[in-house]
């Protein structure tokens, strides 16, 4: 017991100064910046390793999407490089690994070996979510995950023991309804084992909601932080989360969104089995989403289209949000990129341009929004101005230990959100001497 507490204390001391944690995901790597843009980032978290990798006595090797050596060169030599395990929709490996003492010991040992093999400085456990309400909530109801409420803190305790003085962080939900394992009773058991708590104070409305609202407003982000403080979280361990993307939702055409765009009704945003029905989504702040189409576009010959491919689809074909040419609704409806092909009806790109031009600031809720009445779309996103308010009204006021963002590769058009966070740290949460 003494050894475990001592190791935990060492790790906590290593993150005591105000910090900036940044996720780097494998799906947005085209224009990742170098050191001249990443000043102030203390923790770079490569995402993701699959949760199932660590349950075997002879585990499969984890293969990072970029070599850790190359990734380290993008940041200051003092930046700690971590790896995140899990992510949205990847919970099965955690459920299996946490179920009993033997499975927890095996999982933790394998994680420790993986960190050593790749030279990582720590691990982030991105379990969305212990106790239920994950992507699989229709296939695996919460009633079948009740045991995870008790095993989750034990799982973290085993990891703490196994990785020694390396950094252990967790990504935790932003929506109160997802706090199934995060209660006054369980909170202290969870937080004692970890060095950082990355609060996903974004996606605060999602496709399970039925009215519009801010996905990451100042007020609802503050509400989330207060919920964690209420269940025993040490503010020095909390990192306030920021999202480098805008979200859009299809509104009910019979609702009064013109008069009351905040709180107006949405259409059903999920299929009956809980899967995405394409009536909501996200748009990142990277060149492929935000920049005008290059003038020298060629016709696609390999089925790829969009900014990165520098190609448009042949006549009559649509360019999907993921950058592929096709003619079905999957390519031509919601998310269709009108700069790179034909769209049938809704063009997310065109709607977003209107949102950027005519967006409105909700000073009370602390978020930017826009209602596109022509397409019945509601947009919600963060701006540098509201990021500054979050530093003043949440990070400074609540004496939080730091901030985090998802993800670096999603802000590569102008780096406005990254720069706003760097400025916020300078203004409201200076580094310790």
Which residue ranges define each predicted feature?
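Substrate-binding surface in catalytic domains of secreted glycosidases
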Residues: 53-66, 130-292
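Conserved, mostly hydrophobic/aromatic
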Residues: 44, 83, 125, 197, ...
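Fungal secretory targeting signals
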Residues: 1-17
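Structural recognition of alpha->loop->beta junctions
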Residues: 34-46, 100-123, 127-129, 184-204
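A cross-domain feature marking catalytic cores of carbohydrate-active enzymes
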Residues: 24-26, 48, 83-87, 127-129, ...
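Glycan-recognition patch characteristic of GH18 chitinases/ENGases
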Residues: 17-115, 213-214, 339-349, 370, ...
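Secreted, short cysteine-rich peptides and small extracellular cysteine-rich domains stabilized by multiple disulfide
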Residues: 301-344
């Amino acid at each position: 017991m003494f050894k475990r507490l001592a190791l935990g204390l060492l790790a906590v001391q290593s993150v005591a100064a105000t910090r900036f944690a940044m996720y780097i995901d494998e799906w947005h790597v085209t224009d990742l910046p170098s050191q001249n843009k990443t000043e102030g980032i203390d923790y770079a978290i490569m995402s993701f390793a699959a949760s199932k990798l660590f349950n075997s006595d002879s585990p499969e090797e984890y293969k990072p999407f970029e070599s850790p050596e190359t990734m380290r060169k993008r940041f200051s030599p003092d930046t700690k490089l971590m790896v995140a395990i899990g992510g949205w929709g990847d919970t099965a490996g955690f459920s299996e690994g946490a179920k009993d003492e033997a499975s927890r010991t095996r999982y933790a040992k394998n994680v420790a070996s993986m960190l050593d093999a790749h030279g990582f400085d720590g691990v982030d456990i991105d379990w969305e979510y212990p106790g239920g309400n994950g992507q699989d909530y229709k296939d695996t109801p919460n009633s079948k995950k009740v045991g995870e409420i008790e095993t989750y803190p034990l799982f973290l305790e085993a990891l703490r023991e196994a990785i020694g003085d390396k950094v252990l962080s967790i990504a935790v939900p932003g929506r109160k309804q997802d706090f199934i394992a995060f209660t006054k009773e369980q909170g202290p058991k969870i937080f004692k084992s970890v060095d950082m708590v990355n609060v996903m104070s974004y996606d605060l409305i999602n496709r399970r909601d039925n009215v519009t609202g801010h996905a990451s407003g100042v007020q609802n982000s503050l509400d989330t932080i207060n919920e964690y403080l209420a269940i025993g979280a040490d503010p020095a361990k909390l990192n306030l989360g920021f999202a480098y993307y805008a979200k859009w939702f299809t509104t009910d055409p019979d609702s009064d969104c013109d008069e009351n765009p905040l709180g107006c009704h949405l259409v059903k945003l999920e299929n009956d089995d809980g899967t995405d029905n394409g009536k909501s989504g996200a748009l990142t702040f990277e060149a492929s989403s935000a920049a005008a189409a290059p003038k020298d576009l060629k016709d696609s010959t390999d089925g790829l289209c969009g900014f990165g491919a520098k190609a448009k689809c042949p006549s009559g074909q649509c360019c999907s949000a993921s950058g592929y040419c096709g003619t079905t609704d999957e390519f031509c409806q919601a998310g269709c990129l009108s700069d790179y092909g034909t769209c049938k009806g809704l063009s997310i790109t065109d709607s977003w341009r209107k949102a950027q031009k005519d967006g409105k600031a909700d000073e009370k809720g602390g978020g930017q929004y826009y209602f596109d009445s022509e397409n019945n779309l509601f947009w919600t996103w963060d701006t540098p101005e509201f990021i500054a308010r979050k530093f003043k009204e949440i990070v400074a006021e609540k004496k939080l230990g730091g901030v985090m963002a998802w993800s670096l590769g999603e802000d590569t058009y102008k780096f406005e959100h990254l720069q706003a966070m760097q400025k916020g740290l300078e203004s409201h949460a200076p580094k310790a001497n």
